[in-house]
Structures are given as structure tokens and as C-alpha cells.
A protein has these predicted regions:
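Positively charged n-region of N-terminal signal peptides that target proteins for export
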Residues: 1-4
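Cleavable N-terminal signal peptides
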Residues: 8-10, 20-22
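Catalytic glycan-binding domains that act on GlcNAc-containing polysaccharides
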Residues: 24-173
């Protein structure tokens, strides 16, 4: 996990001129701690870079650094829109942001709230829908976990329910 975090944040930090990833974007944000995060040398490929306008739009709307969205996209799918994770899990993930079936209800509600139309799981393959939803999830995780970027990345990777169970069992560290 430490390698994943380092790779994801390396792409963010190497492409970003910001000193704090969400400074001012999240209510009561007190700054960003990078303690314990190793910076790697991951690069974004051309497929991920082709979605950068979407990352900027969604990032602006939800207070998430577009470079963080790009880094997560790179890690999750390498920008391959038809990417499908079939690892034997009953909850496969699809699209450039690897949105899982478990998020079906919240994805549909997000679509209805933002566009007036309930989105289906098939809509995960539409980057214009998947990227804003991912930005929304990230912004909500940053609020929920008090701007703890490690927990936000873990929440995106494992799912909020799994992370909350781990925290309940092992503590908040």
C-alpha cells in the first residue's frame, strides 16, 4: 500500500504547483500532512493526460486537485476506459476511475442530483460521468477522514465500509 500511495502522490506532486492539495477547498481544512508518505517517480501516460480537462472541471467543482484525480486514474486503469477488474470479486469495477458495483445506488443518485437523470452502472464507462463522481467521492472522503490523504486513498481503494471496519478493529492509526 505504501508503494501505491507514493506512486499516486508522486504523480500529483510532480504535476502540481500547489503546496497543499486541497487548501481552501474543504471547510475547516487545517493543512495537509504528508508524514509517512514516500514520493515515487510515477508518470502519467497519454491516455490519462487526454482526460485532464475533465479532471480540472471535476476538481474545480468538488475541491479536489485535478492532479490527484489523474494520479488515481493512472493507478486504477492507466486511463483505459474499458478497463474492467475481474479479480474474482463479486463487486467488479469498471471504467477509468474503476467504480465498483457496490456504488450503484450512490452513482444513480449522484447522476439524478447533478443531471436530473439516474445513472446506471453502464454509465461508469462514460468518463464525463465517472470523473465527477470520483471527485465527489474523494471530496466526501476528505471531509469524513479530516483531510487525511492516506485514509482518503485507502477509502477509494478499499471502499469506505471496509476502511471504517479496519479503523474500528485496529484503531485510527
Amino acid at each position: 500500500m505504501k508503494k501505491f500511495i507514493g506512486m499516486a502522490l508522486a504523480a500529483v506532486i510532480s504535476a502540481s504547483s500547489f503546496t497543499a492539495l486541497a487548501a481552501g477547498a474543504i471547510p475547516d481544512h487545517q493543512g495537509t500532512s504528508m508524514d509517512g508518505i514516500e514520493i515515487g517517480t510515477a508518470q502519467l501516460n497519454s491516455a490519462v493526460k487526454s482526460y485532464y480537462d475533465l479532471f480540472e472541471q471535476a476538481g474545480d467543482q468538488y475541491g479536489v486537485d485535478p492532479n490527484l484525480l489523474a494520479a488515481i486514474c493512472m493507478q486504477e486503469s492507466s486511463g483505459r476506459n474499458l478497463s474492467y477488474r475481474d479479480d474474482g470479486s463479486e463487486y467488479p469495477a469498471w471504467g477509468i476511475m474503476q467504480i465498483e458495483n457496490t456504488l450503484e445506488k450512490s452513482f444513480a443518485k449522484f447522476g439524478e442530483d447533478t443531471t436530473g437523470e439516474k445513472w446506471t452502472l453502464q454509465d461508469r464507462l462514460d468518463p464525463t460521468k465517472a470523473v465527477p463522481f470520483a471527485a465527489y467521492l474523494i471530496s466526501q472522503s476528505l471531509i469524513r477522514y479530516d483531510c487525511d490523504y492516506i485514509k482518503m486513498i485507502q477509502s477509494y481503494n478499499f471502499g469506505q465500509t471496509v476502511l471504517d471496519r479496519i479503523i474500528a478493529a485496529k484503531g485510527n492509526d
